[in-house]
Amino acid sequence: MQYYKVLNEEMNHHRFQYKLGLNIDTSAFNDETCENGLHFCRKEDVLSWLSFGTKLAFVSIPETAKVCHFQNKSKSKADCIFIEKIIDLKDWNEWENENFCLEAVKRHGNSLQYVKNQTEEICLEAVKLNAYSLYFVKNQTEKICLEAVKRSGYALKYVKNQTEEICLEAVKRHGESLQYVKNQTEEICLKAVKQNGSALQYVKKQTKEICFEAVKQNESALEYVKNQTEEICLEAVKRNGYALRYVKKKTEKILLEAVKQNPLASKYIDISF
């Protein structure tokens, strides 16, 4: 029967150096524990170990080997294994099998990078699990991109053709994904700062409304307001007196509101005031 083992580039696992041919474990074999032993798996279980490396070893078990198959585990172990050949994981012909690929991306979104024939269904399943696997999508559709940014707004970084709808979905999920928006509109910026006031730092064209909404969501966003008005500063310190530290021009009214909200904010009052 053909078995497999996923290996890293160094082909070293738990201090054991694997090689082509016969590999013999240096530790005493114990069939009562998963510890020690040289592990391997069936073809259908390779998917459980994709994150362990980029190499795939084709394994057979010598007749004289001591073997233990673990129930409810996706692996087995032996005191010796024979590695017939080692290939790059990306070159495995199973990546041409659509059903196999679909199952793979459902377990590891980034395995999309190995899929030879990417279908929209496969890509959608990949980004549902890991939004950043959008990076590996060869033919991006709006549907795939929307699914990705709904999972993580930061996936917008990998969207090749941004639409306003995609950008809005991204900043609704994570306001700071505004940093990846190529064409900012006031609506997109407002959505972004309403989700996370700190997104104001990425707004290219600040308006009074955008700044006001930003400090309403997060008073510390006052730090990023380029044109501080008394109204905006008051909104910030009314919510958190400590926001006084970001006020450039401290008026008496602002100071009073700040210490009223938090007496300890007085430490940010200039002595010379």
Role assignments for model-derived ranges:
Residues 25-89:
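ADP-ribosyltransferase catalytic core
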Residues 1-35, 54:
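ADP-ribose/NAD+-binding catalytic cleft of ART/PARP-like enzymes
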Residues 269-270:
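Short, T/G/N/S-enriched strand-turn elements that build extracellular solenoid repeat scaffolds
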Residues 102-263:
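Thr-biased low-complexity repeat/linker tracts and other Thr-enriched repetitive architectures
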Residues 93-100:
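Leucine-rich, hydrophobic repeat-scaffold detector
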